[in-house]
Amino acid sequence: MEGKEEDVNVGANKFPERQPIGTAAQTESKDYKEPPPAPFFEPGELKSWSFYRAGIAEFIATFLFLYVTVLTVMGVKRAPNMCASVGIQGIAWAFGGMIFALVYCTAGISGGHINPAVTFGLFLARKLSLTRALFYIVMQCLGAICGAGVVKGFQPGLYQTNGGGANVVAHGYTKGSGLGAEIVGTFVLVYTVFSATDAKRSARDSHVPILAPLPIGFAVFLVHLATIPITGTGINPARSLGAAIIYNKDHAWDDHWIFWVGPFIGAALAALYHQIVIRAIPFKSKT
């Protein structure tokens, strides 16, 4: 097809590429048309170079995300006092800023998920196939492990003594509080992703798709400000897994299930809310 990159055409399957972030579903007259749902399982994707390129993009993005953010956490932990470091606000900015930058960089390649919870939510909304969702999640987790591993390689002593950036439920909070914080925090993030990338909004003349990463990164920043004191803020199972594996202390694993169950529940609720309540897709008449 003219105008497409050559590597996308190599082994491409009969279904068009679906990039949930930063793409617009529109006609020449800007009339809105509901995009078709992704197939549940599409083995044909395994023959497409663009499929593997997207997975590599998710790996590199999550690697860079963990590298920068865990280094920031280590810098705050090693400081003699909060005034000598960027503090909680700086950590929140590092997480939110990296998501903004990385989503901007990878949106046109993989959709810029960088988070298994985001991938799961978009899968439930039929924005991508199970094949692609599982591949993304594996690559995200591998990237997170490598990113945290590089940080430990640079400063192994400080990494181990300062917690390795691992997520744990803070003293004074119950497991239920930690789980609730992760559910609500992930709901905020995934709901923002759906709203910022909504195909109907993208069809409007006034919408600027390139700005989609901005509210997503800002949502990550705000959630971190709210929940760092409770759980250190997970809302990203790959981020939590990478830090836990490299740090590998018992207390990092005690509550680890919270940082998978909470984000997946939050993502599922956000997907259901956006698709059923906000967009009312199941209730729309078929034409």
From Swiss-Prot:
This is Probable aquaporin PIP1-5. It is found in: Cell membrane. The gene is PIP1-5. Keywords: Acetylation, Cell membrane, Membrane, Phosphoprotein, Repeat, Transmembrane, Transmembrane helix, Transport. It is a multi-pass membrane protein. Residues 1-55, 114-133, 197-209, 279-287 are cytoplasmic. Disulfide bonds: none annotated. Aquaporins contain two tandem repeats each containing three membrane-spanning domains and a pore-forming loop with the signature motif Asn-Pro-Ala (NPA). Belongs to the MIP/aquaporin (TC 1.A.8) family. PIP (TC 1.A.8.11) subfamily. The modification Phosphoserine is found at residue 285. A motif (NPA 1) lies at residues 115-117. Residues 77-92, 155-175, 231-257 are extracellular. One of its GO terms (molecular function) is water channel activity. The chain crosses the membrane at residues 56-76, 93-113, 134-154, 176-196, 210-230, 258-278. It comes from the Eukaryota.
